[in-house]
Amino acid sequence: MRARNAGNVGTVPVRPYTIVSCAISVDGYLDDASPDRLILSGPEDLDEVDELRARADAILVGAGTVRADNPRLLIRDERRVAARVAAGRPPHPRRVTLTASGQLDAAARVFAGPGTPLVYATAAAGPSARKNLRESAVVIDAGAELSLAAVLEDLYSERLVATLLVEGGSRILRDLLAAGLVDELRLAIAPFFVGDERAPRFALPARYPHDESDPMTLVSVRRVGGVAVHHYRLGERFKLRQVPS
């Protein structure tokens, strides 16, 4: 895969409309360092994320998130599932993950749901991924190095993914944001600290395009249950309809 024009500067990019949605502590952590998953948001926030999932054509997470959190990446509300089916869409978005090691377990919940997930693997990781997953996923050769721009272009051009929801992990979030491949950022901030440098952070060090000279546009700040949801526009493709009322 080779990206032709996956960014959002100058011309219309050949990639999905990309939304990043994640929950963090007030000091910027995505989780703590314990074996158990840290709960950062409540039912009201999770319901809004479920609505974002229902609007998306695919949901993307990294292999580290699959191993650490074992997510299902399915729509929870059956009414939203029914609405998608009534509109002629698949019941759930396509599930997508990326791996540079191929170390994925076919028993993970992400591979157990309806439909066939996509796994983008480096050339070196592809054989291991295919051996481990067998018929549980379609493994796609992403070249010597995983290019997120090329992955997004493939999702758009070959898999017909028009809207992509990205839910983690920290390195994928960093790389997408640093490469200018995100149109919309939804950040749910929990009212407590983690304070553990071993824990994964939201914004890892990088050269981000939206610095003090070109900041993101703050669209809204809302209280949703016990968290504060910050909503940002990162490019000209922003769709105002994505903001819940």
Task: Name each model-derived stretch.
Residues 1-245:
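Enzymes that bind and transform nitrogen-containing heteroaromatic metabolites
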